[in-house]
């Protein structure tokens, strides 16, 4: 491939990705506020400019950037769910652009790059893509990738003017304004990276570089501020177990093991797609454990390759992604075991977090492919890539087939909103996907009185 065609590829594919995502959003959603929007309506509408709703003790857990965007949406657009959905799609596109810029800089091969983008813009994230309340999470991951990219070019000796300042300022902006709960892994992996890089530098030079300490401090301070704010938040987990972990761990240790393995398997084939395939008799349910084991093995092999070939001395980006992906799996296990379902970690809502590690694995293989001498290992890598392509391709196919049904669900919500009195509590809870019929009615009353969203 010529340099001109390669540059075209690196630019065109990250643009085609969000275009596909926006098309999918149009096909699978409609402008109807339900599910998580019920809580948002009751908490912030209609007086979205009220400072008392902004300056609250747990302000950081509510993600401050949401406030001006929500205020604009309500005041100017009449509370458009579609607006939020588009922001989410554009946020994913921005993240893809950052990853694409890294691939262009490192001259990742065309086949590897196309595989990377295929997985990056896959529909295994459908639950996030069709829930506008989570648009900011896509922006957060774009910011994470950008920070990792800046760190990578500084450490590889290709830093730009102002990069050191960026490394110190970005954590304050990202953690305090954009990241929300995702700041835990973002901050944790940066602290690990700075410690690791400081040790590597010390081994080379025989002295400690104070820059790593300052960078780590600039990560730690906003993280502590977030933790203080988070300590004042009150969370509601409908249907969750409220007791301690130890008794459950002793009584049902297998659930935790299955949860962890399945969360990795979900990155090959999303939960609903897997269940469809099992129900149709395409494959046994036990396949999820094989897929999960294969992904876990890929993590370990990619980590070993980074260390064996000292890839981190040339580029730290893949190693950071691998560490972040693994930490996300651990975090989801520790925070979501309370639902006592071993398949909960396979949910599409976590694919955005888990795919970070998949990107790191693929980039590691792409950058070291010519250096890997083991033919057996190369065969395993190719088989793993085929598995990822097939599983995610099947997920995309099933989701495209399901999209009209998701859109129809939203249209039914809009129809029901016009005459709520005709429906029972059970019908409202089921269709609006929220646990309280009374709160659904309260939220719809707010929208109706202020001529917002479905009542415009």
Label every PLM stretch briefly.
Residues 162-194:
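Membrane-interface alpha helices of multi-pass inner-membrane proteins
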Residues 31, 83-87, 125-136, 346-350:
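Membrane-embedded glycan-lipid processing machinery
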Residues 103-123, 141-142:
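Transmembrane-helix signature of polytopic, membrane-embedded enzymes
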Residues 17, 113-120, 217-227, 310-338:
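Transmembrane alpha-helix segments characteristic
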